[in-house]
């Protein structure tokens, strides 16, 4: 397999991994520690991820409990969660922070599905851009006589197969997330 095919596979996988991360950040009405990904707390002047400052547990389906290792950081963590606009209200008793995840309304579920579809479409575009770049590189190599026309055709077919597989994977992830959001 050529370097271009391997590179194409790697780039397409990165697009799928990125999609998975983005979908994990979308709450489906259940408590999930991924909800706090990307929330940074001002801890002694340095932005620090919540996961490094506290243990996060999910004792109930709609409840997230954050137990800071350093009790003095409770206020800062609460402030960072409020600033992140996650659509949740943290409540604190001075030692732990509880986040009650509200049940999603039908309207909000449909909004989230729209967001998921947009994110999915962006991922498909990223995969197709990788395909285009790879095919351009293959054509350039053929033009420079680095590969034969048969090799070009074979490798272009390989790139298309990788693209088809990646698009199927994206669609599978989207369908799973949509079902997750729409299930009550």
Curated annotation (Swiss-Prot):
It holds the Pfam family RRF. The keyword Cytoplasm applies. GO terms for cellular component: cytoplasm. Residues 133-153 are annotated as: Disordered. Keywords: Cytoplasm, Protein biosynthesis. Its main location: cytoplasm. HAMAP family: RRF. Responsible for the release of ribosomes from messenger RNA at the termination of protein biosynthesis. May increase the efficiency of translation by recycling ribosomes from one round of translation to another. PANTHER family: MITOCHONDRIAL RIBOSOME RECYCLING FACTOR PSEUDO 1, RIBOSOME RECYCLING FACTOR. This is Ribosome-recycling factor. It comes from Staphylococcus saprophyticus subsp. saprophyticus (strain ATCC 15305 / DSM 20229 / NCIMB 8711 / NCTC 7292 / S-41).
